[in-house]
Amino acid sequence: MYRLGLLFACALAAYGQKINVEFDRGADFAKFKTFAIRAGNLNSRNPALNSELVKKQIEADIERSLSAKGLEMTTGRSDLNLRDTLGSARRVETEAYPAGWYGWGTRIVRVPYAEGTLVIDLRDPTTRSLVWRAIATEEQRDPSKLQGKLDSMVKKSFDKYPPKVK
């Protein structure tokens, strides 16, 4: 029974959020003390995502996450300029269910869903170069859970800030 539970937990983990972070290894992240949020983009045909309320929520989550890391938000000159982009794409999940002997009657089921992507860029305004980027992707099957998913995507993205250079 323990093995079955472990297998189920591993299967669930495969369907979770995907967070990818890349950064400039030559950047000195200790010098960044302030940030400013610049106009982001909402690139979605999904009306649940293409909303000013969603944009404000993302910006509030970002501000909360960076403030917890010791950075201060400013509206003037800043050490980092932040821009976020939210988009969504239609995807189709295909599953095959064998229904009979010798492969006869295999049933194919296609389930459409939306996949949301949040890209957060941090740029150094003095050099105008990208110093840190997080790309968070997750399935959006239930619109009522959107707010919690966005909160989680932002938090998990900034769990990897500042990056640890190896």
Residue ranges: model-predicted function:
Residues 1-7:
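Sec-dependent signal peptide recognition
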Residues 8, 39, 138:
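Residues that line or immediately flank small-molecule/substrate-binding pockets and catalytic motifs
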Residues 8-16:
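Hydrophobic h-region of N-terminal signal peptides that target proteins for export
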Residues 15-69, 77-86, 165-166:
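A structural "domain/chain start" motif
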Residues 17-32, 110-117, 122-166:
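C-terminal/domain-edge helix-coil "capping" segments
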Residues 19-20, 69, 80, 84-129:
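Surface-exposed short loop/turn segments
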Residues 38, 92, 99-100, 148-151:
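Short, charged/polar low-complexity linear motifs in solvent-exposed/disordered segments
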Residues 42-44, 72, 87-91, 127, ...:
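Solvent-exposed loop/turn segments at secondary-structure junctions
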